A protein has these predicted regions:
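Core catalytic region of metal-dependent phosphoesterases/phosphodiesterases
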Residues: 1-48
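Acidic, His/Gly-enriched loop-helix segments that form or flank divalent-metal centers
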Residues: 40, 49-51, 55-158, 162-168, ...
Length: 183
């Protein structure tokens, strides 16, 4: 998937690709020393089956099954994964602003200027963002918290239809005030 996206961007397609928490976890796994995201539950790492790192590495032919030594899996990853793909993930922007829209992976911390948002919040926040009902400076378009279908909440639009849980991606069309699923 990373190669497909990189090829599209290189070909000049008008795609905006934002960094998500799983992209950062992949990048951090590929660093020496290996970095662990502090937002993960104790006992979990990016390689935990719930987080998808094991499947990501399997797509490169790497066995990350339980019982293997982390340093061995990481060494195999260094050999198998093109450095350009990790550089691409590392360089992805955290946000994108267009007109009255503010696109971000997880959300924002309410009442903090958009220019002062922390990376951890942009990639991981749930509360107090999800329960905040007042207006944000811009309409926030996000994912990270799966719903049955995309939903408009007045001050934010959650586009996460649960693809991380095996459900299909849900493309949407956005105009100044509305959101319409395309399928």
């Amino acid at each position: 998937v990373i190669e497909l996206i990189m090829d599209g961007v290189a070909a000049g397609r008008n795609w905006t690709v934002l960094k998500g928490n799983h992209d950062r976890m992949f990048d951090w796994f590929m660093q020496t020393p290996l970095r662990q995201d502090p937002h993960l539950q104790i006992g979990h790492s990016w390689l935990h089956p719930r987080l998808g790192g094991d499947k990501t590495l399997a797509s490169y032919g790497i066995d990350a099954s339980e019982g293997r030594r982390l340093y061995e899996v990481q060494r195999e990853a260094f050999d198998a994964i093109p450095p350009a793909q990790i550089a691409f993930l590392r360089a992805l922007p955290l946000t994108y602003q267009h007109a009255n829209w503010f696109f971000v992976h997880a959300g924002i911390r309410p009442n903090i200027p958009l220019s002062e948002q922390l990376e951890d919040d942009l990639l991981w926040i749930r509360e107090p963002f999800l329960s905040y009902q007042d207006r944000h400076p811009l309409m926030v378009v996000h994912g990270h918290t799966a719903l049955d279908a995309p939903a408009h909440f007045g001050n934010r639009i959650n586009l996460d239809g649960g693809a991380g849980y095996g459900r299909p991606l849900v493309p949407v069309a956005l105009n100044e005030k509305t959101m319409r699923p395309l399928c």
